[in-house]
């Protein structure tokens, strides 16, 4: 995959070249999307809109730390949707990991989560965030036990995963409504890189075959159900709904 690669570390140790080789990234000087290695982390930037800033994965500080400490935890909609209750903490495959937010919420609540991400740039960002998270004195221990990354396309990988999870979680990128100047800056940068998941409808069936208990699909509240398969079961919030489908028992 082509992207502009920028090293701002000043280290001159070739770390960015190693990273590019690992994720199959090719430097393209003219690409509007840039993957930047800073002294602190790896981040994604939209070069023609510098005011949007850089996107990076941070499980240790910032919004994620706040959500871990002060968020709803087990009471969060995603936790309710996957079925966390009492001692029941399902094993989850997050088949559209993105920046890992929902996966992290579930891991924080006690679930073991395997994240699948097919885009190599996003996978590199996730891997960078995980490495810093694993090294953190406060959360590193449980994060290593509960949150893992698999770089693969869910369309093919869902049939190969073992052991089977109790829950498969899907949050496909859905095109935002027009005139959404207020779409978060981060989402604008992210969508510029990955675009909508036009093949997302193909995920529902393999997800249902893989999950032993349920499949949870996060949708904007204005979006039709995935693959146009309606379900009466959903956890609904102000802006989203978490549609719930039966899996395939062992």
From Swiss-Prot:
Localization: Cytoplasm
Record's catalysed reaction(s): guanosine(1516) in 16S rRNA + S-adenosyl-L-methionine = N(2)-methylguanosine(1516) in 16S rRNA + S-adenosyl-L-homocysteine + H(+)
One annotated Gene Ontology cellular component of this protein: cytoplasm
Pfam families the UniProt entry points to: SAM_MT
Gene3D superfamilies to which the protein is assigned, alphabetical: Vaccinia Virus protein VP39, YhiQ-like domain
Enzyme class, spelled out: transferase
Catalytic activity, EC: 2.1.1.242
Principal subcellular localization: cytoplasm
Transcription is among the record's keywords: no
Superkingdom to which the source organism belongs: Bacteria
Keyword annotations of the record: Cytoplasm, Methyltransferase, rRNA processing, S-adenosyl-L-methionine, Transferase
Molecular function terms from GO: rRNA (guanine-N2-)-methyltransferase activity
Residues reported to bind S-adenosyl-L-methionine: 101-102, 117-118, 153-154, 171
Entry-linked PANTHER family: RIBOSOMAL RNA SMALL SUBUNIT METHYLTRANSFERASE J
Family: Belongs to the methyltransferase superfamily. RsmJ family.
Function: Specifically methylates the guanosine in position 1516 of 16S rRNA.
Protein name listed in UniProt: Ribosomal RNA small subunit methyltransferase J
Gene source species: Escherichia coli O127:H6 (strain E2348/69 / EPEC)
